[in-house]
C-alpha cells in the first residue's frame, strides 16, 4: 500500500515537473528566461508587442480598456498563429498635452507621454526582442492616436535590419478591424452611426463586455461625459462579433506580412 502511494506521488511530481518545463502560457512575462530561450529555439520566433493606453472611457468603463483588450486579443491571435508569444503591454502612450490639458488629458486618470518617448520605448523593446532571437516583431496598437508613430518605428527598424533576416511589422489592420470595420458591421445590423460611436460608445463597450466585463459599470451606461456614441444597448454578443473579426483579420495580415519577407 505504501509502495503504491509512493509510486503515485512520484508520478504526480513527474507530471508537475513536465508541465513546468513545457508551460502553456504565451505571455513572455510568465516564462522563465530558459523557457523563453527554448521556445524560441523550438520555432516560436514571432513576438507580438501589444500597445494599449491608459485613458478615460466615460463614467462606465475603466481607464485600462485598451490595455486589457489588446492583452487578451493578443493572446487569442498568438494561439491561432501557433509560433508566437506575447510581450508585456505598453500602457503609456501619447494621449494629449498636459499644460494646458488637451484631448483625454482633461479627464483624471489619463496618462500621457510624448511621441518621441513613446517611439524610443517601441524601438528599445524591439531591439531587445531581436537580441532574444525573435525573427518577427509585431506591433499591435489598440489606440488610434499613435498609429503613425508605430508605423514609423517599424519602417525604420525594418530598413535597418534588412540584411539580418529580422523584421518589424506595424499591423494597422488590427486597429482598422477594431474601429472602422467593426463599426460598419454594427451599422449593417441596424445600429446607427451616432450610437455605434467612436469612443466608449456601443462598439467600444460591447467589445469590452465580450473581452472582460469586469471593466464595465453596467449601471452607468449613458452617452456624454467623455463618451462619443451611446453605450446603452451594448452587449457581449455584439462584442464577440468584433473579437472574431479582429482576430481573423489580424492573423491573416500577420501571416501575409511574414510570408512576404
What are these regions (language model features)?
Residues 5-15:
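Bacterial N-terminal signal peptides
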Residues 20-138, 142-261:
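Extended, histidine- and acidic-residue-enriched regions that form the cofactor-binding/catalytic faces
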Residues 1-2:
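N-terminal secretory signal peptides that target proteins for export/translocation
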